[in-house]
Amino acid sequence: MNYPTTSFPARSGAARPGEPAARAKTFPEKLGLGAGQLGLDQPPSTYRGRSPEKESAEILSIAARAGISVLDAQVSFGQAETTIGRIMPRPCPFRVTIKAGRCDRGPDYIEDEARAALRRLRLDKADAIMVQAAGDLFGQHGEAVWDRLRTLRDEGLFRAVGVSCFASDDPVGLTRRFKPDIIQAPVSLLDQRLIVSGALAEIAGMGVEVHLRSIFLQGLLFLPPDRMPTALKGASGPLSRVRRMIAEGRSDPLQAALGFALSRPEASSVIVGVASAAELQAVIAAAASPPPDLDWDEMALEDPAPLADKGWAAA
């Protein structure tokens, strides 16, 4: 999962007057929290003197109080799931999403891992289970794994089964073939490929839930010019132009990124990752503000380097 790797800057200024005030009433229903950035699957460390577990407990508490509806608990290791299960508010206030195990190990392994993940999270059932790589469904066990996941859904273990994919995975073709309940894909203010192509609208038109991830494009919009990776130097000019347009619209990068994603009519959920309680509070404040009046179409990057599906490492 690609969640932002750069701390959010301080927000600058209020929303523009005259914009719809109803935004604050609707954002929690769309906003989801990704657990992959919490650091629970990393070696023990501290954040400003606090352990990742204590920081994560506060993050989950803030999310619950704010009415954030989705907890995407697709983490790398079972220990992280165990920790989330221990610190999650009870009764669980979230619609929890978990990841499916490795498809190449077959359907029995997938089912065993799914049930084990629920035990670690201390849940009887979860909202959704996601196949992590669309290509896995075309492997030796792909069809059998998908059939097993749908069986688990029909038995009530999950409400929905879905696939996490990239723009290069042909999400529309994937949806037509496998008929998932959820498609999760990277879409952002800077990466609008699935919007421009009409893929997102077509998928939503099939009755499939669309969950947006990577809405901060790994923090690229927040990255200072002097920290731009060498491979992305060519994007410096377009990024400066986008930042200027945002500033001229009396907004800031965080509010613009969230406003764009949350206002997409195709999206059922918008998943964000945070590393601290302060970051989540900044996200909630920005999301509750009316979306800025900006020309979204003009902000999409055309340079393929920052949009590469394999991502890049922020230097």
Predicted features and spans:
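Beta/alpha (TIM)-barrel catalytic core signal, keyed to glycine-rich beta->alpha loops juxtaposed to Asp/Glu
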Residues: 9, 13, 134-314
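Active-site groove signature of glycoside hydrolases
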Residues: 118-137
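N-terminal binding-site loop/beta-alpha segment at the start of enzyme catalytic domains
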Residues: 1-94
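Active-site mouth loops of central-metabolism enzymes
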Residues: 40-54, 99-108, 137-139
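Alpha-helix-loop-beta-strand connector modules within alpha/beta enzyme cores
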Residues: 82-99, 147-156
